Amino acid sequence: GGGASQAQISQRNLELLDIYNAEIWHQITKNWAFSQEMGGGHANLEAVIIVKIMRDGEIRDVWFEKRSGNSYFDDSAHKAVKKSNPLPPLPEGFLKPFYEVGFRFNLSELERHP
């Protein structure tokens, strides 16, 4: 048949997801309010949050894979994700019922998104 191979479909999905990830990360960081003073001057704080996104962009679940150890920092990252609900719908070619993705929150990321 003249259909696309599984590898081509996967490659296209990865490209779509890269674009989607950049889009939703931009949306989340816009909602991220954190001041370094409140973090007690720790420049190396980092938290990893996993987000479960439904096909329509609804955030169904949010949990920490790794906490920073600073509750103010962790709360600010968690709130940024919650505030971003709903996200844009998943890309057309993405066939699974939901998408789970991890976001790494750290202060160097925050500085890059003024």
Question: What positions do the PLM features span?
Answer:
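Compositionally biased, low-complexity segments enriched in charged/polar and small residues
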Residues: 1-48, 54, 58-63, 71-75, ...
